[in-house]
C-alpha cells in the first residue's frame, strides 16, 4: 500500500512540475515555429507491374560476380539463346534466339539499335562489361510500348544499359583502375572515372585495352581408315592474336524525375588474326582483320502533362573494316569497307486512362557502304501500339509496324542502279515496277496476352503472335559472285502459349527472391530464308 501511494505521489509531482514549466516551454516552442518553416515535398510512385513479356535480366551484383570480359560471355547464362563463337579472345561472337538467326536479333545500346548494314552481324565481343549496368533479353519484343518503331521489328531483343554515375555525399569524383591478366598472354587494363558537374549533370568516361597472342595448345589426332593412329600430338594455335582498344564517354543531365538527356561517344579499334580451321596439317592462315567502329548518339526523354511522354534518339555511326588474306596458296585478297549510318527516331506515348496506353513512333535511317561499289539504303519505320491492363487480371499489348525500304547502288563507273525487285527476276519493266512497289513496303502485326485468373496465387496464362521481316544485307544483295539483287526479305512468324507460376519468398529475412516455373509451347516459321553458300 505504501509503495502504491509513493508511485502516485511521484506521478503527481511530475505533472505539477510539467505544469509549472509549460508556459515557458510554450513561448520557446512558439518562437521556434515562427522561425522554422520546413519545405514541403510530395513523393509519388507507381506500383511496379509485372511485365506482360517477362525478360531475363542480369544486373548489379550479378554482373560484378561474373568472371567475364565481354557482353557475349554474360549472355551465355540466358536460356533460349545460341552463341556462335569463332574461338579465342579475338573470335567474333554473335547471338541468336530460338535458332532464328542473328539478323532477326536486335541489340540495343542505351535504347538505340546497333547496326551493321553490310552483313547484319553484331559482334558482342566488342562490348565490355566494365561499363554495363544491366542486360535484358526479351523473346518477341519489350513489354513497354513506349519504344522506337524499329524495336517492334525484331524477333528478339537484347538491351544493354550503361552505368549511371552515382556519387556519395560530398564527393564529386569517382575513379576505378583495374588490371587483369590471364593465360595466352592476356592483358586487360581498364580505367573508369565519373565527374559531377552539378547536382543534375555529370560526365563519365571509360577506356579499356585487350591484348592476347591467342597461342593456346590443343590436341591434334589423326586416325587412318584402318583404325590405326597415324599421330597424336599437341599443337599450338596460330594467328589467333588480338589487340583492341575501347573508349567511351558520356554527358548526362537528369533535370527532373522523369526527364533527362544524354550524349554518348563510343570508339573501338582492333587488329586481329583469323586463325581458320585446322585441316590437312595446315597450321597457320594468313588472314588479318582490322576493325574501327565509332558512333555518337543522343537521347532525350520526358513526361509532359503527366499523361504524354516523348522520347527522341539520334545517332551517327562510322565503321571501317580492312581484310587481308596473305595465304601463298591462294590469290592475295585485300578488301576495305566503309559504312556510314544516320538514324533518328521519335516515340510518343499517351495514357488515356490508368488502364489504357497508346503509342506512336517514327524512325528514319540512311545506310551507305563504300567498297567496289557504293550501296545506299533509306529505311522508314512507322508504328502504332496499344496496351491495356484490366485490374491486373488481363494484360493486352498489340502493335503494327510499317517498314518502307528503298535500295540503290552505283558501280565504280558511276552508273546508278535501282534494285527493281526482290522477287523472281522480272522480264519486263512493268513487272519490275510492280515488284519494286511490293518489296519496299511491309506491314507486320504483333499481339501479346497475359491472363491471371485469380489474385490468390501468381498463376498466369501467356500467349503471343508476332510477324517480323528481315531485309537482305548489302552482302546478301551485292557481294561479288554470291550476292543476288533479287532476294526476297525473310518473313518470320512466331506464336507461343504457356503457363507461368511465381512465388516470392525471403532468404535470411531479405525480400526480393522468387521461385518461378514456366511451361511454354513455341513455334516459329521463316519463309524465304536467306542462306549464304
Feature roles, as predicted:
Residues 26, 214-216, 234-246, 252-311, ...:
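Flexible loop and strand-edge segments within Gram-negative outer membrane beta-barrel domains
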Residues 35-66:
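N-terminal periplasmic "start-of-domain" segments of outer-membrane beta-barrel proteins
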Residues 311-315, 319-321, 454, 461-466, ...:
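Membrane-embedded beta-barrel scaffold of Gram-negative outer-membrane proteins
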Residues 72-113:
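Extracytoplasmic beta-strand/coil segments of soluble accessory domains associated
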Residues 358-456, 465, 471:
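Signature of Gram-negative outer-membrane beta-barrel scaffolds
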Residues 32-34, 165-173, 199-200, 256-260, ...:
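Short loop/turn motifs that connect adjacent beta-strands in outer-membrane beta-barrel proteins
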Residues 129-176:
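A beta-strand signature from Gram-negative outer-membrane beta-barrel systems
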Residues 162, 179-185, 209-213, 267-271, ...:
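Transmembrane beta-strands of outer-membrane beta-barrel pores
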Amino acid at each position: 500500500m505504501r509503495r502504491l501511494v509513493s508511485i502516485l505521489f511521484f506521478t503527481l509531482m511530475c505533472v505539477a512540475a510539467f505544469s509549472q514549466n509549460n508556459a515557458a516551454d510554450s513561448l520557446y516552442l512558439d518562437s521556434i515555429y515562427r522561425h522554422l518553416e520546413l519545405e514541403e515535398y510530395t513523393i509519388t510512385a507507381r506500383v511496379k507491374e509485372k511485365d506482360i513479356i517477362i525478360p531475363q535480366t542480369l544486373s548489379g551484383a550479378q554482373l560484378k560476380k561474373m568472371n567475364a570480359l565481354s557482353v557475349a560471355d554474360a549472355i551465355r547464362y540466358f536460356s533460349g539463346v545460341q552463341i556462335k563463337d569463332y574461338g579465342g579472345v579475338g573470335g567474333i561472337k554473335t547471338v541468336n534466339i530460338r535458332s532464328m538467326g542473328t539478323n532477326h536479333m536486335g541489340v540495343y545500346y542505351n535504347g538505340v539499335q546497333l547496326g551493321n548494314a553490310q552483313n547484319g552481324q553484331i559482334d558482342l565481343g566488342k562490348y565490355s562489361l566494365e561499363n554495363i549496368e544491366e542486360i535484358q533479353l526479351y523473346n518477341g519484343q519489350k513489354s513497354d510500348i513506349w519504344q522506337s518503331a524499329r524495336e517492334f521489328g525484331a524477333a528478339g531483343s537484347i538491351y544493354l544499359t550503361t552505368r549511371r554515375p552515382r556519387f556519395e555525399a560530398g564527393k564529386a569524383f569517382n575513379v576505378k583502375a583495374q588490371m587483369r591478366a590471364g593465360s595466352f598472354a592476356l592483358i586487360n587494363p581498364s580505367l573508369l572515372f565519373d565527374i559531377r558537374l552539378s547536382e543534375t549533370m555529370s560526365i563519365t568516361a571509360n577506356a579499356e585495352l585487350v591484348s592476347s597472342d591467342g597461342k593456346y595448345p590443343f590436341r591434334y589426332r589423326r586416325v587412318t581408315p584402318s583404325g590405326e593412329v597415324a599421330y597424336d600430338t599437341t599443337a599450338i594455335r596460330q594467328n589467333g592474336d588480338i589487340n583492341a582498344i575501347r573508349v567511351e564517354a558520356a554527358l548526362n543531365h537528369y533535370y527532373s524525375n522523369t526527364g533527362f538527356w544524354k550524349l554518348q561517344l563510343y570508339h573501338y579499334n582492333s587488329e586481329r588474326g583469323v586463325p581458320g580451321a585446322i585441316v590437312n596439317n595446315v597450321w597457320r592462315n594468313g588472314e588479318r582483320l582490322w576493325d574501327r567502329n565509332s558512333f555518337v548518339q543522343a537521347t532525350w526523354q520526358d513526361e509532359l502533362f503527366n499523361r504524354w511522354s516523348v522520347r527522341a534518339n539520334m545517332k551517327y555511326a562510322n565503321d571501317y573494316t580492312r581484310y587481308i588474306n596473305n595465304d601463298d596458296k591462294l590469290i592475295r585478297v585485300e578488301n576495305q569497307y566503309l559504312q556510314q549510318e544516320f538514324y533518328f527516331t521519335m516515340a510518343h506515348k499517351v495514357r488515356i486512362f490508368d488502364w489504357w496506353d497508346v503509342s506512336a513512333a517514327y524512325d528514319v535511317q540512311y545506310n551507305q557502304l563504300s567498297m567496289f561499289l557504293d550501296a545506299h539504303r533509306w529505311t522508314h519505320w512507322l508504328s502504332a501500339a496499344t496496351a491495356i491492363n484490366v485490374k491486373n487480371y488481363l494484360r493486352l499489348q498489340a502493335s503494327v509496324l510499317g517498314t518502307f525500304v528503298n535500295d540503290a547502288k552505283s558501280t565504280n563507273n558511276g552508273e546508278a542502279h535501282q534494285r527493281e525487285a526482290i522477287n523472281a527476276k522480272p522480264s519486263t519493266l512493268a513487272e519490275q515496277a510492280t515488284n519494286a512497289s511490293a518489296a519496299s513496303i511491309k506491314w507486320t502485326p504483333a499481339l501479346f496476352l497475359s491472363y491471371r485468373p485469380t489474385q490468390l496465387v501468381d498463376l498466369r496464362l501467356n500467349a503471343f503472335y508476332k510477324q517480323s521481316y528481315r531485309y537482305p544485307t548489302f552482302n546478301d544483295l551485292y557481294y561479288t559472285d554470291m550476292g543476288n539483287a533479287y532476294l526476297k526479305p525473310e518473313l518470320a512468324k512466331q506464336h507461343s502459349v504457356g503457363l507461368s507460376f511465381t512465388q516470392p519468398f525471403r532468404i535470411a529475412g531479405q525480400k526480393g527472391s522468387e521461385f518461378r516455373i514456366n511451361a511454354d509451347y513455341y513455334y516459329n516459321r521463316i519463309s524465304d530464308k536467306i542462306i549464304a553458300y
